Amino acid sequence: MIPVVALVGRPNVGKSTLFNRLTRSRDALVADFPGLTRDRKYGQAKVGEHDFIVIDTGGIDGSEEGVETKMAEQSLAAIREADVVLFMVDGRAGLTPSDEAIAAHLRKIEKATMLVVNKVDGIDADAASADFWQLGVDEMYQIAAAHGRGVTALIERALDPFFDNLLSTNSEGEIEDLTNMEDEEAEQQEYSEEDAEESLKRLQDQPIKLAIIGRPNVGKSTLTNRILGEERVVVYDMPGTTRDSIYIPMERDGREYVLIDTAGVRRRGKVHETVEKFSVVKTLKAVEDANVVLLVIDARENISDQDLSLLGFALNAGRSIVLAVNKWDGLDNEVKENVKKELDRRLGFVDFARIHFISALHGTGVGHLFESVQEAYRSATTRVGTSVLTRIMKMATEDHQPPMVRGRRVKLKYAHAGGYNPPIVVIHGNQVRELPDSYKRYLMNYFRKSLDIMGTPIRIQFQNSDNPFENRVNKMTLSQERARKRMMSAVKNRKK
């Protein structure tokens, strides 16, 4: 499961700065759900090839009389969702009573906690950090979040227990120069045909993992129980924590599935509960672990920013997507038309996803959901050979030639599969990374249409082909060497 890191500390110690630095390589998901404080942010981040979730637990002021109340509610819940807590303090401001109060509270929680002294750029880091040893910590890490110094070493150390061979040689907490970090993160991962075959084999050996996600009270619980009820599968009533989804194996039409239930543990008698506990972390973990994401939207409410945020997260994760517009029954035709127009207007960026209008309560349209789930999964995992992809690429370039870059025509040579779920097409050629975004979108849409891909995003990766003669030095023949000597001798005689 993807690990979760919580940033804790009093205001203005640099939590948001570190949050933005960690999540900048991918769109940060900012959650503003009912029941959550507005200043708590959840985002997806990456270290090396490993993903993790980071939470900015804003709103903790650490006041001596109010720390128990402040931390006991939303912020404490976020800390409990985390695998690792980064307790941030301000190296320039020094130790404060607020820091001591927060540290005392964190000691009561059995959670891996690391002390992070921020803002140590331009000052004596060791001298600025000395007072913080009073907090009784075993290890202290010094960083400058605004400039990225020490951040990679910190995160590698924090996540080392969750990933093998993560630590670099420079991970002892010292200040390191990361001025080129953005360029390193911008580099694309290179995919080979062997990687694609391995990922496809793993997918073929497993059941389809289907995550049902959505805002609170859109009908996820009702839909889950409707699906399970139709299949006569016992609803598991297992104890779970606030951050763990329930994995329910089921079978439909001879196909094995694992339903990832994010709506929480419920008994059959509680299907119509109006209050639902919502965990952002639980939802993000479910998306990361799923093959197909079923996003439930309430037809009686406008599409919200939270709907778009969840959809964007699933899209960034490369998951297949099916949309279910729930509570469709009872709406008059005029309202239905307005809802459809709103869907077309706001969800154009996922025009590849099937949309179903359903009633989870009465079962209307629920059975057809699995047709789209299977279609999306099939599109995401169907093997496509190099010859087919190369032929499609050549057809695309014949219909619309690549543009000129610095006076030279970009040349696309061949294409092969680089991965599945989502499908990744790797195109090799000259200057291919210089292609404008408009032409990249053209190629992506051309491949999608040609391969009849539906329900899943498709990714195109470009790799510049190596020049086999780049470092080659031609050896002169004997006659060429003699001619060269005669020419050099003539030049010398002319100078005399």
Swiss-Prot record:
Family annotation (Pfam families): KH_dom-like, MMR_HSR1
Residues where GTP 1 binds: 9-16, 56-60, 118-121
Biological-process GO terms, alphabetical: ribosome biogenesis
Ranges for domain EngA-type G: 3-166, 208-381
One term of GO molecular function: ATP hydrolysis activity
KH-like domain residues: 382-466
Keywords: GTP-binding, Nucleotide-binding, Repeat, Ribosome biogenesis
Described function: GTPase that plays an essential role in the late steps of ribosome biogenesis.
Subunit structure: Associates with the 50S ribosomal subunit.
Family: Belongs to the TRAFAC class TrmE-Era-EngA-EngB-Septin-like GTPase superfamily. EngA (Der) GTPase family.
Identification of the protein by name: GTPase Der
Protein's organism: Vibrio vulnificus (strain YJ016)
